[in-house]
Regions:
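Active-site glycine-rich loop that binds ribose-phosphate moieties when present
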Residues: 233-239, 285-293
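Cofactor-cradling patches in redox/metallo enzymes
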Residues: 187-275, 312-329, 335-428
Length: 428
C-alpha cells in the first residue's frame, strides 16, 4: 500500500465528516446500547465489534482536525495519527462485522445514525484501497460486466428460456411503454430462477405489462456495499437510463435488500436528479395488486411458518406491513419472531459481508442469534424476501443441522395463484 493511498483514504474520510457526522460524534454518550443491538457483538462478546467503535479512526480524525481539544492533543503528541497499519486492521471491523443493518441506529438514545457513519467510513476505506478483495472483485465485475457475480446476458436468456417453457408464457425483453421494468439480482438468476417464473405468472394473471431490459437487468449495487458513491451512481445510472429509454412507469426492485436501498432511497441523490418513474419493491407491487383484487390466490400453507424481515427492506426501507398482508392470504399458521419487524435481527451476511471469505467464521457465529430465534418458535418453514438473506439462512441452518426449508414470499404466492383468465388489458 502506497503512502498516496493512505493520503487518499484520509482525504476521503475528511470529505465524509459533514455537519451531521460532527454532531453525532459530539453527542455520543458512550452508553454502549449500540453494542447490545449488534449481533456481531452479542454473539461473540468482542468489545471491538461495538458499532460506534468501528468508526474510531474517523472519530479521531474529526477530533484532531476539527476540534480545539483534538488539535491540542495532536500538537502535544497525545493523539496518534492514523496509519496504514491501523486502517488495514480496521478493514475487518468495517466490512466483516457490519452488515449496515441499521439496528444500532434504531436504539441510539440520542438519535445518531451509526449505520450511516459506518457507510461513510467505508467511503474512506474504499478510496484508500483498504476494502476487502471480495468486494473489490464484485465491484469491478459490476462495472465491467454488469453483474457482481459475472452474470452476462446469455445466462439470463437461458433462464428466460427455461421459465417460458415451464410457464408457457412469453417473457418480454426491451419492450417500450410497459408499466413495469423488472430488475433481477444475480443470485436470483443463478440460485433462485423460480422467482422469474413466479413474477411471470403473477403479472400474467393480473394483466399487467412488464419488461426486462437487456442493458440493465441487474439490481445489485456493489457500490453501496463497498462504500463507493461513484460506483453506486454509475450502477444506478444504468437503471435510470434503461427506465427512461423504455418509458416505463415503475421500476421494480427484486427480493434483494441493498438493491432496494440503492435504487429507491439513495438513487436520486446518487444521480443528482429526481426520477421520472416510481421505484417499488416487488412486495409493494404485490400488495397493491392484492388490494386491487388483481392478486387472486387459492388454498393455504398448512405449515407453521415465520417471516425473516430483511433489514434493508423492512427496518431501513419501511416495507413492514406488505409482506404480512400477503402472508395473511395464504398462511393461517404464520407466527412472528421475537424482535420482528423493524427490530428484527439481521441474517448476518448483508452489506457485502457474504462477499468476504475471511468473514465466514464471524458470520457463522453471528448466525447464532437467528438460530435462537428460530428454535424458540419450533416452526416448519421460514419465508423471506431477500436472496442474500435466503442464502445465509440456508447456509446457517445447514451448518447447525436444522432441517428447515427457506422459501421466497413471491414464489410462495405464485404457488397459490388461482387459475383463471388474466384481466383484459385496457386498450387506448
Amino acid at each position: 500500500m502506497s503512502e498516496a493511498s493512505l493520503e487518499r483514504g484520509i482525504a476521503a474520510l475528511k470529505e465524509q465528516i459533514d455537519a451531521p457526522v460532527a454532531a453525532f460524534f459530539s453527542s455520543c454518550t458512550h452508553c454502549g446500547m449500540c453494542a447490545d443491538a449488534c449481533l456481531f457483538h452479542t454473539e461473540t462478546g468482542c468489545p471491538t465489534y461495538t458499532p460506534i467503535y468501528k468508526v474510531e479512526p474517523m472519530r479521531r480524525l474529526w477530533e484532531q482536525e476539527y476540534t480545539l481539544l483534538g488539535r491540542a492533543k495532536k500538537a502535544l503528541g497525545l493523539s496518534k495519527p492514523i496509519t496504514e497499519e491501523e486502517l488495514e486492521k480496521w478493514q475487518s471491523k468495517v466490512y466483516n462485522t457490519c452488515t449496515l443493518c441499521g439496528r444500532c441506529s434504531m436504539v441510539c438514545p440520542v438519535g445518531n445514525d451509526i449505520t450511516g457513519m459506518i457507510r461513510k467510513m467505508r467511503e474512506g476505506m474504499s478510496a484508500g484501497g483498504f476494502a476487502p478483495e471480495g468486494l473489490i472483485g464484485a465491484s469491478e465485475r459490476a462495472v465491467e460486466i454488469g453483474s457482481p457475480m459475472g452474470v452476462r446476458l446469455p445466462a439470463l436468456k437461458a433462464q428466460i428460456k427455461h421459465a417460458e417453457k415451464d410457464t408457457g408464457l412469453a417473457i418480454p425483453m426491451d419492450v417500450e411503454g410497459a408499466e413495469y421494468l423488472v430488475l433481477l439480482s444475480s443470485m436470483e438468476i443463478m440460485n433462485y430462477p423460480e422467482y422469474l417464473h413466479a413474477i411471470t405468472r403473477i403479472f400474467h394473471q393480473a394483466g399487467k405489462t412488464w419488461t426486462l431490459c437487456s442493458e440493465a437487468f441487474e439490481a445489485t449495487n456493489s457500490g453501496i456495499q463497498i462504500g463507493s458513491s461513484d460506483i453506486a451512481a454509475e450502477l444506478v445510472g444504468r437503471v435510470v437510463a434503461a427506465a427512461e429509454k423504455l418509458k416505463v412507469k415503475t421500476v421494480i426492485s427484486p427480493e434483494c435488500g441493498h438493491a432496494y436501498t440503492a435504487i429507491r432511497w439513495e438513487g436520486p441523490n446518487l444521480v443528482h436528479k429526481e426520477f421520472g418513474f416510481k421505484v417499488q419493491h416487488i412486495l409493494e407491487v404485490l400488495d397493491e395488486l392484492r388490494a386491487e383484487g388483481l392478486l387472486k390466490t387459492e388454498g393455504i400453507e398448512e405449515a407453521k411458518l415465520t417471516f425473516h424481515d430483511p433489514c434493508q427492506l423492512v427496518r431501513r426501507g419501511g416495507v413492514v406491513e406488505q409482506p404480512r398482508n400477503l402472508l395473511d392470504m395464504i398462511a393461517p399458521n404464520f407466527v412472528e419472531m421475537e424482535d420482528s419487524g423493524v427490530m428484527n435481527w439481521c441474517c448476518g451476511a448483508g452489506g457485502g459481508v457474504s462477499a468476504n471469505e475471511d468473514a465466514d467464521k464471524v458470520r457463522n457465529k453471528a448466525f447464532n442469534r437467528k438460530k435462537k430465534q428460530l428454535e424458540s418458535l419450533d416452526i416448519d418453514v421460514v419465508v423471506t424476501a431477500c436472496a442474500n438473506c435466503r442464502i445465509q439462512l440456508e447456509d446457517g441452518l445447514e451448518i447447525n443441522e436444522m432441517d428447515i426449508p427457506i422459501l421466497g414470499l413471491t414464489e410462495m404466492l405464485a404457488e397459490h395463484l388461482k387459475e383463471d383468465k388474466p384481466v383484459e388489458e385496457e386498450t387506448s
